[in-house]
Amino acid sequence: ICFSCYIWNISFVRELLPDLKKILPQVEFWAGGPEVSYDAVEFLKKNPAFFGVMVGEGEETFHELAGYYIERKPETLSEIRGVAFRDENKDRNIVHTGWRELMDLSKVPFAYSNLTEFKNRIIYYESSRGCPFSCSYCLSSIDKKLRFRDTEMVKKELQFFIDNKVPQVKFVDRTFNCKHDHAMAIWKYINEHDNGVTNFHFEISADLLREEELQEMSTMRPGLIQLEIGVQSTNPDTIKAIHRTMDFEKLK
């Protein structure tokens, strides 16, 4: 059983696992996500109910881990990159196999081929990973490499949502408009293919918006898009202290 661990659920996961392990002593529990990836060994030392941790991006690691448990391919956990686990053959000493190389975002499988189970739910979608900023309090600042899903692939997948009249598609890109060409192409596409129903939600940095983008937005149907604007602080001293950059005049 695997748990994705984020800032909003990590305390509950830690509290739940000791009792869950008592109920299911034969089950090996795994954790993954940003709250456990960067101190995986220490996390396992402090949380004995967990057997292992998947570190970093999980798509390929989870696939191989499932292969290990289902058909023992690979034959040992040590053959899987991106995991830390208790080695049963070494007095349960913790083994860390190291981080995987960051994957090509265009190779991540499309998760919504069948929308039946997602009917009337928010669809979460990702067209980029990484963040251009280095806010000192945020784990996103650790990943310095910005990666983008192929724009034509994104358009094709968004058309699937549009054709199915999904109520809302929420982009989880950390700063959607950090690359102008990428953002502009997607905004232009959803504007041209508006079905009158689907709403698209984006997290953006307002001071990065260009006149071309604002002009495109001015032609959109009211409610076609929602913009969640990240303003970490309006105090210049605070912005400097957290190593963030922001054009306050443009933001105003």
Cite the ranges covered by each PLM segment.
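Glycine-rich beta-alpha loop elements in corrinoid/cobalamin-binding modules
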Residues: 1-99
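Short, solvent-exposed loop/turn segments at secondary-structure junctions
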Residues: 6-10, 35-37, 58-61, 101-104, ...
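Active-site donor-binding loop signature of nucleotide-sugar glycosyltransferases
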Residues: 56, 85, 98-102, 110, ...
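Short, charged/polar, Gly/Pro-enriched secondary-structure boundary elements
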Residues: 69, 103-106
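Radical SAM [4Fe-4S] cluster-binding motif and immediate context
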Residues: 106-252
